[in-house]
Amino acid sequence: MAVRKDTKNGKWLAEVYVNGNASRKWFLTKGDALRFYNQAKEQTTSAVDSVQVLESSDLPALSFYVQEWFDLHGKTLSDGKARLAKLKNLCSNLGDPPANEFNAKIFADYRKRRLDGEFSVNKNNPPKEATVNREHAYLRAVFNELKSLRKWTTENPLDGVRLFKERETELAFLYERDIYRLLAECDNSRNPDLGLIVRICLATGARWSEAETLTQSQVMPYKITFTNTKSKKNRTVPISKELFDMLPKKRGRLFNDAYESFENAVLRAEIELPKGQLTHVLRHTFASHFMMNGGNILVLKEILGHSTIEMTMRYAHFAPSHLESAVKFNPLSNPAQ
């Protein structure tokens, strides 16, 4: 058994070996570490070594800091658990090196292998640059957050590593004829809630999960308030009287899960969508038609709940007047004298 201090993070690690099994726990003080050790010693009949206090420059593995980030900050994020799972998988792919040995070169080598499909189930279908960039951003954020909390005292090992340039993905949206076909198939579904969920998404620009998990308390005459949003900010969007009258008048959650039913409805409607945009096409459709009908980009930002205008600007080109001066001032229409 041993109690040792990490000289970089200032914490104390108590290591207890009972019948060949190791139990390790970190403490803020030496006293707490020793108490843990003494309690463990009393609970075992195995022979143990005397306590040793060791100075060590070794840091825990990368996954230790990922878990620490989650415990101190990540669990407050709406996607915290999903992000933790991705980060743990990333640590595993990296071989979970000691955190003080992890550096930009190790990550750069990993990115190359990742894009080559080495860690993919199907090596012929490697991830896109966007996927690797998300991993990069997540891990960089771990070190930045821990540094701000004084849990990581050296430089961020990913400082200076640039993200890959990404191709802009197509934002698919539905035309009027597509909407009619889709709604018809949704209304014919065995899931009685599907048509209403889809109508809410199309009428408000809500994300699928926001509409699917609506409760009675979020609906008031001609308005819906979306909570538990991606930005963690509530937003209220007006709806028509017609849509309001269609919604169930009951307490608690209004709808059952309908994702699989929606997927089947899209197939029956023979609508082809880009990969990864199955339900999000409804949100894109709202935003695209909002701008095509002359809506204001700043108002759209508030309706969608975007944190920055840059996110909303993806829809600016749908505005009727967007870059219309190209028609007026091009050399075919108006050659310079």
UniProtKB/Swiss-Prot annotation:
Residues 169-328 form the Tyr recombinase domain. The keyword Acyltransferase does not apply. Its EC number is 2.7.7.-, 3.1.-.-. Keywords: DNA integration, DNA recombination, DNA-binding, Hydrolase, Transferase, Viral genome integration, Virus entry into host cell. One of its GO terms (molecular function) is hydrolase activity. Residues 60-147 form the Core-binding (CB) domain. Pfam families: Int_N, Phage_integrase. It comes from the Viruses. The active site is at 207, 230, 280, 283, 306, 315 (o-(3'-phospho-dna)-tyrosine intermediate). GO terms for biological process: DNA integration; DNA recombination; establishment of integrated proviral latency; symbiont entry into host cell; viral genome integration into host DNA. Belongs to the 'phage' integrase family. Integrase is necessary for integration of the phage into the host genome by site-specific recombination. In conjunction with excisionase, integrase is also necessary for excision of the prophage from the host genome. Homodimer. This is Integrase. The gene is int.
